[in-house]
């Protein structure tokens, strides 16, 4: 599995661990609930069953609609707000979920998110979601945060 695919898998696991609805972003969900959420987003984004399968199997998006599916899930989990910007509080929680706990690096999740919050992102929310995803992984690596294996 390529490095980027592996990172995408972990990001999606982290996102899906945070919550299922915008009202309860930090509730854990199971695979069935994640599929339900992805299918809800499928209808909203024009994504296909294949795009949902790709998301559920943690493969990189190939089509624009698949990126939009990812953005939709991020918005429903309040990782990304309705204007396409990173939600600092929820993104920090995401980084904490995704990384192994290291007391010496307690401030690192906030630093990761601060860097990613400041990046120039495309106006298109679908492409922005992907840009944030890449930034989070890059910054986690730079801050020495190890990804939690799920």
From Swiss-Prot:
Keywords: Disulfide bond, Secreted, Signal
Matches recorded under Pfam families: PBP_GOBP
Entry superkingdom: Eukaryota
Tissue expression profile of the protein: Expressed in the antenna, mostly on the anterior surface of the third antennal segment. Also detected in the maxillary palps and in cells at the bases of the taste hairs on the proboscis and internal taste organs of the head.
Signal sequence, start to end: 1-23
A single cellular component GO annotation: extracellular space
Gene Ontology terms describing biological process: sensory perception of chemical stimulus; sensory perception of smell
Family annotation (PANTHER family): GENERAL ODORANT-BINDING PROTEIN 19D-RELATED, ODORANT BINDING PROTEIN-RELATED
Similarity annotation: Belongs to the PBP/GOBP family.
Protein name in the entry: General odorant-binding protein 19d
